[in-house]
C-alpha cells in the first residue's frame, strides 16, 4: 500500500445538489444508480466522500469530476479514473485505487487506498 485516507461528510451536504437539479461532480451513471434507490442522498454522499478521498490522495490537478464510483452487482465498488487522475495515480507509483463505502442516517464515509502496481 502506498497511501490511504478516509473522508466523512454529512449526508445533508448532498441534498442541495439534488434539489438544484444539477449534477455536481457526479456522472450520469452515479446519479442513475442513486436515484434508483430509496435513499439517493446517502448513496451520493458516500460517492462524494470517495471522490474527495481520491482527490486528496491523487493531488493537485485532479478534481472530483475526474473520479467515478462504479458498482457492479455482487462486486465491491470501484473507481473509474479520468486520464488525468490515472496519470496522477501512476505518478504516485500506484497500480490501483481501492474504495470502500458506508453510510448511516446522518453521515457517509469512504476509504480509498492506493496500492502498488504488481512487480
Annotate the PLM regions.
Residues 1-119:
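Core catalytic alpha/beta fold that binds nucleotide/phospho-ligands
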